Amino acid sequence: MKLAKQVPLYYYLILLASTAIVIGIQWDISWHSTIGRDKLLSPPHLVVYIGGIICGLICTFIVFKETFFNKISEGVAFWGFKAPLACWICIWGMIAMLTSAPFDDWWHNAYGLDVQIISPPHIVLAMGIFSVILGSCILILTRKNLNPSNFIYDILYIYASSLILVQFSIILTEYSFANKQHSYEFYKVSSILYPFVLIAFKIPSKYKYAATYITSLYMIHRMLIVWILPLFPAEPLLGPIYREVTSYIAPYFPVLLIIPAIFIDIIYP
C-alpha cells in the first residue's frame, strides 16, 4: 500500500483514461453493428475523445511542471517547453484523435456508411490512440527504470502493454473473424504482428512470464466486453433491417494469444 501511494496519481488516471478509450472503441464497433450510423458526438465517441483529452491534459500538466518548476529537467525541448518524450507522444496522439473526429464526420457525409473498420479517418484515429497508449506506456516505463524497487510500476507497465495488445486486436478484427481463421491471410497477419508486440513489450519487463501476464489481461478485457455488451438493450435504427436484435452485438471471442505467449516466455530468456 505504501509503494502504491508513492506512485503519482496521474499515472493511474492516464491508464484509466486509456482504458476508457479502448472500451469506447469496442463499444463504437458494437454500436455500428447493432444500431447503425451514429452522430459525431454519440456516447461511444464521447468516451473515446474524453479519454484522449484526459491523457493529453495530464501530459500537458507534466510539460508545464517540467518546464517551469524543474530547473534541471533533461526532457525533450519543443517550442521552449521541456518534457519527457512520452508526453509529447501522448499530446500528438490526442491531437490526432481530435482531428479524426471532424474528418470521420465529413467522410460519412461524403461517402456514406463505412463498410470496414479500416478507413482513412479510422487510420488517423487508430494512430492517435496507439500514440496515446504508447506514450502512457513509455511514461510508466521511464518511471519504472528510475524506481526499480517499486513493483507497482511493473504492474502498471504490464497493464498498459495489454491495452496496446487489445488495440492491435481491434485493428485486426476483420482479419480475425471465425471464417477468416482458416485462411492464409489470418495467419500471415497474426504471425507477424502479435509476436512482434508480445516480444517488444516483454523485453522491458523484469518478469520472466511478462508476455503471459500481458495476454492474460488482454483475454480478460476482451472476454468482459463479450459478456457485458449483450446485457444492454439496443435495436437497429438504420434500414433496411434484415435481422432483429434487442441488445448490443458482442465481438467475436478473442484470439487465444495466451498459448503462444507461454511458449514465447519459455523460449525467450
State each model region's role.
Residues L46-F64, I123-I140, K188-K206, Y252-I267:
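Hydrophobic cores of alpha-helical transmembrane segments in multi-pass inner/ER membrane proteins
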Residues Q6-L15, G36-L57, F81-I89, V115-G128, ...:
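Membrane-entry segments of alpha-helical transmembrane domains in multi-pass membrane proteins
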Residues L13-I23, C87-D104, M127-L134, D154-Y175, ...:
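Alpha-helical transmembrane segments of multi-pass integral membrane proteins
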Residues V76-I89, P102-A160, T173-S183:
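Membrane-interface helix-loop-helix junctions at boundaries between adjacent transmembrane segments
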Residues I225-P269:
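Anaerobic metallocofactor- and corrinoid-dependent redox/one-carbon enzyme cores
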Residues Q26-L46, F103-I123, I170-S190, I228-T246:
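Membrane-interface interhelical loops and short amphipathic "cap" helices
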Residues M1-Y12, W27-D38, L57-L85, A110, ...:
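Juxtamembrane membrane-water interface segments of multi-pass membrane proteins
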